[in-house]
Amino acid sequence: MSLLDYFRSNKKQSTAQLAKERLQIIVAHERSSRGGPDYLPQLKQDILDVIRKYVQIDPDKITVQLDKKSDELSVLELNITFADDKKG
């Protein structure tokens, strides 16, 4: 095999390798579109249960967001709009 034959050859990936790469792309896409770790809904519920012990809150006025700043830093942001208790 000459050097020119090496560069001319059309190297084909095996079917298994191609399927593996496609699956990795699909899994990465699913993870990124999922929006957060699996424990996030339960964490949100636990935090809200504690807050409800002290004040009334409207579940529609709550937002929870997990932002990944880097590989080592994630920020959990919890925004709650409290009802106005002022009368008269």
Curated annotation (Swiss-Prot):
Q: Report the superkingdom from the record.
A: Bacteria
| InterPro entries, per the entry | MinE, MinE_sf
Pfam families, A to Z: MinE
Q: Which GO terms describe its biological process?
A: cell division; regulation of division septum assembly
Has the keyword Zinc-finger been applied to this entry? no
Look up the coiled coil feature and give its residue ranges: none
Query: Keywords for this entry?
Result: Cell cycle, Cell division
Q: Please give the family membership noted in the entry.
A: Belongs to the MinE family.
NCBIfam families in UniProt: minE, PRK00296.1
Q: Its biological function? A: Prevents the cell division inhibition by proteins MinC and MinD at internal division sites while permitting inhibition at polar sites. This ensures cell division at the proper site by restricting the formation of a division septum at the midpoint of the long axis of the cell.
Query: What name appears for this protein in its UniProt entry?
Result: Cell division topological specificity factor
